[in-house]
Regions:
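Function-dense linear segments that define catalytic or interfacial modules
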Residues: 279, 286-314
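Long, basic N-terminal domains or extensions that often function
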Residues: 1-283, 288
Length: 314
């Protein structure tokens, strides 16, 4: 049993596309593997704005063998009056790959027919995945797709890398002008170079080391901690907003929060208007004081750390 890992490295995908795309990718991949008689465990998904990934553990190295019964010519055509196989029976046996002596006669609704039991040996899983993975990628639905570089393929955003591993082996295939391999990009600003992934088990750890938190739960938790830390530093507390946390986590690869201020005269504007403006238009978190009143500041989430964070938001 091996672990399968597929990562599609892209330009920045809209935050709202990511969740549905991951659901589709994982469901489609598991169905295609089941249909191909590849035993497998559960799927786990990963993502950032610049990548969509799915991991499947306990993947068999070969297809499950399949035994099927194939009907041939009618008995009277396949065997002569003495019960010996005719040319028709011999050709049927040759066609399905069995010995003439292995042929049987079966009663059917249409009469008695020559039949053969044929056992299909399982193909290597890597061979099957060379066909399956491109189908999964191109079959991923998005509200809008785009073409690029005059290629006859579409995706949410241009594809730059494809990481495809079964255990420590690459699953080789091409999609447009991109070949699969064992490389993924680090953080766009803090580590823009490619990194080598030797095995799926190293994926999360290696990307974390290049400032990419690909685990959705880990990145969400960091967003919450960063927002809480920044709001405390500003002298207040963040206005709870789980939905905004989910949105923001898909806007960044390595969340770093900063507090900004606005003119306190804007607090004369109805609370709901201020919150909506910050939340919907800027994806900012509102900050409240101990009495629950809005403070003239907000928390913004950055995708990189600067030398002087005070210059980022004022």
């Amino acid at each position: 049993m091996e672990t399968l890992l597929l990562e599609i490295g892209t330009e920045e995908i809209p935050a709202g596309y990511i969740g549905p795309a991951l659901d589709s990718m994982s469901a489609t991949l598991l169905k295609k593997m089941t249909d191909a008689r590849i035993e497998h465990g559960r799927a786990r998904v990963f993502a950032t704005p610049r990548r969509l990934a799915v991991e499947v553990k306990k993947v068999a190295n070969k297809q499950t063998p399949l035994t099927s019964e194939i009907l041939g010519p009618p008995e009277k055509v396949g065997f002569d009056k003495a019960g010996k196989p005719t040319v028709a029976a011999k050709k049927f046996a040759e066609k399905v790959g069995v010995s003439v002596n292995a042929l049987k006669v079966k009663d059917t609704d249409k009469g008695r027919y020559v039949c053969a039991k044929v056992k299909e040996r399982g193909l290597p899983t890597r061979t099957l995945l060379k066909r399956i993975l491109p189908e999964v990628i191109l079959g991923t639905p998005f509200p809008k797709t785009m073409k690029w570089a005059e290629l006859d393929i579409e995706f949410a955003r241009p594809i730059h890398t494809i990481l495809a591993l079964l255990g420590d082996k690459v699953i080789p295939f091409s999609l447009g002008d991109t070949k699969s391999g064992r490389y993924a990009f680090g953080h766009y600003f803090m580590h823009p170079k490619k990194v080598k992934i030797s095995h799926p088990k190293d994926y999360i750890k290696i990307l974390r080391s290049v400032k990419v938190l690909v685990d959705l739960a880990e990145r969400r938790k960091r967003v919450e901690k960063e927002v809480e830390k920044a709001s405390k530093k500003a002298g207040g507390a963040v206005l709870p907003d789980d939905e905004l946390v989910d949105i923001v986590k898909n806007l960044v690869e390595y969340p770093i929060a900063t507090a900004g201020k606005f003119d306190k005269n804007f607090l004369d504007v109805p609370r709901e208007v201020l919150i909506t403006a910050m939340r919907e238009h800027q994806k900012y978190f509102a900050v409240i004081d101990k009495k629950g009143k809005l403070m003239p500041c907000f928390i913004a989430m950055n995708n990189t750390r600067t030398r002087d964070m005070n210059l980022v938001a004022t």
